[in-house]
Amino acid sequence: MDKRLKEYIKSGGTLGSLAKLPKGRAASAPFPCDPAKVYAKQVDGLALRLKRIGVKDVVIGVSGGLDSALVLLVAVGAFKKLSLPISGIHAYTMPGFGTSKRTKTNADLLCEGLGVKMETISIAKSVRQHLKDIGHDGKTPDAAYENSQARMRTLILMDKANMVGGIVLGTGDMSEIALGWCTYNGDHMSMFGVNSGVPKTIVRKVCKWWAEESGQGSGGRGQESGVRSQESGGRSQRSRGRGMAAKALLDIVATPVSPELVKGQVTEDKIGPYELHDFFIWNFCKNGLGRKALYDAAAKRYGKTFGLDLIGRTLDTFLYRLVSQAFKRNCAPDGIRIFSFDFSKESWSIPSDMPTGIL
């Protein structure tokens, strides 16, 4: 057992369902990635889940961001694999107070290019009424203002899934799950977490790969993985659809990550670069490095890119949130394991009351 955890237990803490931490190994580059293989694993995982539970309809909230874009691509691939009609993919975009024209447009274009019908449901009116009902002024951009939007979207998706006898596909990725960067019982919850085993940096790589494969229009791996539209029409129509989806996807890849709960939000301005967080996830959870070793390894690898001050602040954020937000991981939906570990309780967990100072 890790000596830090022994000290924690001696001080009165309990392990609960903590998975045994590995002995400290040398730091390594995080999450070795072949985008085609990651995508194929996600497609296979979703297809297997749908087949086992006998469901032919899925519901997805498409925001125009990276995570929901990848889930939509995986759903198209899984439906192709199962020979299911693409009409069983129900996409919804739910603009709120911080939604930008760029993300809304990209959500529309991506769905159109893939041949997926999408419905727009504005949450502004219902959230304003909810905030009024609970005595909120509807203007102060506090936690209730932001989280009520995320929970309203989840409520809509869950009810829509009930209406079609389907399941809600979760969009949260492995990095967000590690950090608890989600709204409890909002985007935190779904019926199957398609991205739960894929960190943010890999989500970006897979989306970029998909767009480049599709944009070639040569009928290569991308079409075999479900890129080819299932809608009827000639070759030129399919080619235009692929081109439209690829163009939208490349702009999504270039868009700063944001939940868009208030205007101008940029996630990495608040929590630090996802490139660092994914490095910390891999080297803490898999390689067992402690705080000092993590900092030294990150400084050596990323010092010139991010600077030592940002590395230190991001590491503090990572360790604090990894522990303090563990309660969200303790009641998360099933997902797909892509790499050698994930944040399911059967794979890797940590006491949510552990003092981060011992890490």
What does each of the following model-derived ranges do?
Residues 1-64, 68-217, 238-359:
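ATP/NTP-dependent adenylation/nucleotidyl-transfer catalytic domains that generate, transfer
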